[in-house]
């Protein structure tokens, strides 16, 4: 098998500029994801008063410890219903991704009732359709954590 060669020059100015720009974008993305977590966590007192776990705590307890969880669609609904980039909360009131439960790779879908009481939006519908299509193609079981 032939070895792949690269023309990327990590020491070049253009590479360094591109890398710096990309890292800034990743930091911004992560700050938007954190906005979603913070918005959900504002309801922690309500969950505790009801004797409930938060959506992320339920997810954490479901997943196999030490195994990866690949979250998907974390930017769904961003600036859709609320066009203000400074206050819009991404995520479409759901946490979805692929993780391992009892050693089995699964699609996990958690309704995040900490955001807008878990109300489904049009974007939530797009997310659910997308992940269910992935599950069919990849033959993944689905676990849906619902709070009603």
Placement of each model-derived feature along the sequence:
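Terminal-region recognition feature
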Residues: 1-148
């Amino acid at each position: 098998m032939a070895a792949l060669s690269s023309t990327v020059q990590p020491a070049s100015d253009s590479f360094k500029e591109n890398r710096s720009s990309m890292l800034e974008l990743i930091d911004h993305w992560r700050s938007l994801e954190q906005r979603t977590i913070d918005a959900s966590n504002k309801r922690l007192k309500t969950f505790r008063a009801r004797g409930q776990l938060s959506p992320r705590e339920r997810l954490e307890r479901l997943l196999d410890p030490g195994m990866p969880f690949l979250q998907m669609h974390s930017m769904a609904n961003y600036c859709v219903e609320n066009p203000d980039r400074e206050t819009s909360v991404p995520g479409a009131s759901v946490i979805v991704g692929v993780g391992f439960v009892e050693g089995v790779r699964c699609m996990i879908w958690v309704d995040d009732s900490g955001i807008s009481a878990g109300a489904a939006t049009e974007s939530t519908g797009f997310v659910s359709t997308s992940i269910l299509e992935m599950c069919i193609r990849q033959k993944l079981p689905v676990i849906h954590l619902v709070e009603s």
